[in-house]
């Protein structure tokens, strides 16, 4: 008898457990007389992702004791059928009060805005626009984000006002810029160009503004070119009023023009390679001039504007430490252009000067130069190995390297150059054979993997797409950058486009997983743009 009772108890517990995982159990409790049970039912349905309960949950928006939880649940459960109920539930009378009722009403309005944004129905635009003007910051943040999700073009004036409002919180400005990009209307371009250069409370909005302009794409090219050439009177007046330096404007417009990759911008960018800032302090003038030049060079490299090669080469210097960043970006741009003659010029410059810049230049040359450059690297390394130990120790220090025995310093310094011969050795073996370069994608040396990525991209190898997609997640930033560029180049190859579109979800997943990882921040900004480009194929 005791065993029978125990068996019956266990059976009842199992049934109860199964019942609580069944949405119907909780749907039946939504009209319970006890408000606590109704709230619990809504919460459980949200946990169970029971979208079939959306209609019943939406009905509880009229229940003041359950309204907030119902709105929260509809963020996950709601669909177009719940839009009207959510709109009716918006409290347009609440202010920014600190009493419990006002706080609850504002929390509920924020959750309604989030639910409407997640649903993405344009009918929500007018209500969200009203909420974007609320006095409560939480409500405004949720509403502004939702306006982007529903692509409410009628909100562009309000969102633009937020961007230009000096009193607006930085986070709200960021949300407004993102929303303008999602809406994708060229009417947002003036506000977005302001966003490129403004700062609020020490916060830059360049990432959000540049990406939003990238999303708008071709319609942004002419306005950006006019700004870069001081041909937009409205922008000039705004920049003067807001004390925005020309160099920052030129550099950041060049950045976006490079993202969009529209050939119309090439002449404008070529002109910026010769920019000289008018600041009376020579050091500041050089710094600002270099800023504009390196962004212009980077943009021309992205666009593979081969005609820019000699002008970009002229920016490469191993002599002045102030030119380190400019040299790095210019050398990288030359590796993207892929003109082998420019690699020979880079290797000549690597023969003398500051060691950090020499290695940057030699590495760039090794990523696209002819195999014969390996002989020059070997000669260079031999010369370094015969240097004086004190000089070698000093140069290793500039590279953040150390050695216990100074007598070994010159050997270690020479190795920094000789190691760069590996991608040139691979080029000697592979030549223009894509299958050979595909095998090199698994090479233990990151320089070889980077060179293989570039070679496959230049060759238009559709078969390389899966391997390159994997390399876009490589731990080495050099390899990531090369794989991202190669995939971008392949987007112009019709045979590669189906495979490229197929990897867009994979790249989106990678971006989500790596969000917040500062080491990959810059690389993933590039990958983010690539993912959008591929998803649009």
Where does each model-flagged region fall?
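Sec-dependent N-terminal signal peptides of Gram-negative exported proteins
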Residues: 1-16
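Structural detector for internal amphipathic alpha-helices that build alpha-solenoid repeat scaffolds
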Residues: 15-19, 36-50, 56-59, 67-80, ...
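Bacterial Sec signal peptide processing site at the extreme N-terminus
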Residues: 16-28
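Alpha-solenoid HEAT/Armadillo-like helical repeat scaffolds in large eukaryotic proteins
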Residues: 25-29, 56-64, 85-100, 127-135, ...
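Substrate-recognition/specificity elements adjacent to catalytic centers across diverse enzyme folds
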Residues: 310
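HEAT/armadillo-like alpha-solenoid scaffolds in large eukaryotic assembly and transport factors
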Residues: 497-500
